[in-house]
Amino acid sequence: VNILEANNVTKNYAAHKALDDVSIAIPKQSIFGLLGPNGAGKTTLIRIINQIIMCDEGEISIKGEKLHPKHIKDIGYLPEERGLYKKMKVGEQLMYLAQLKGLSNAEARKRIKHWLEKLGLTEWSGKKVEDLSKGMAQKIQFIATVLHEPDILILDEPFSGFDPVNANLIKDEIFELRDKGATVIFSTHRMESVEQLCDDIALINKSQKILDGTKRDIKNSFKSGKYVVNYKGSLNGLSTNFDVLDTTVVQDDLSESMLQAKAGQLPNDILKELINLIEVHSFVEVVPSINDIFIDIVEGGKS
């Protein structure tokens, strides 16, 4: 079941088409990676979903209904350009933002207390935002995004400004929110986070959707029949099932070679031949990373 769908969305500016007939479907309770280089159109799509701007063609639907002002309460949005009121105290700021999202005074107080404790910020509740470090301010902005327990979280580069410890803390919170029922749309050009977090992804480049699907299916579709084998012995002879692309000596008598399967050859065929030639220590298929795929597509490779 898809919680959010964008159908044939186009957005034009005077001299530039920011989105060109983009369609995506985001499964309920997934972590969905909206990927693309800077300027690809990701933020434009996010702004349309948040009803900050309108699309020129196409439509967005949430929970099967055409996008409507009532859906704003279903969304928590953490923009890349963070914005907190510097002179306001942390607790007051969170209370103000919670009430904008429709929480009662009592419920807001309870949730603010819970989240400040959870992220280790209780003692900062009475301090002004300008007194916080960048990482602390990021945490406060994250709390403001999730306070009203929205069904859809849109996080635009959520890890910028975090050290590795706090980035992991936020990752854990994202997983927990997903497990409790939230759908997370995660917009980024940092591919290592995508590998760790996302179930499904869509790649936007130059205003168009280039590919989408589950992370596993996309990675499998970009496999190119390459294998890495660690072994003792020699692979100098000609082979019926594979070509040796390159070889390095790992230690003493242990070597590692990159193999390219010949057309139509299966892993079992290659492994059987290897076992007859050498003492195999490990044999692994090369699966491209999301980063490899991203670079390949954006720089004009396979699409």
Residue ranges of model-derived segments:
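ABC transporter nucleotide-binding domain
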Residues: 172-258
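ABC transporter nucleotide-binding domains
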Residues: 4, 11-205, 211
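ABC-family P-loop ATPase nucleotide-binding domain
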Residues: 1-10, 300-303
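A short, local hydrophobic-aromatic micro-motif
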Residues: 7, 20, 56, 245, ...
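Alpha-helix N-cap/helix-start and coil->helix boundary motif
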Residues: 10, 68, 91, 191, ...
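Short, charged/small-residue-rich alpha-helical element at the C-terminal edge
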Residues: 224-303
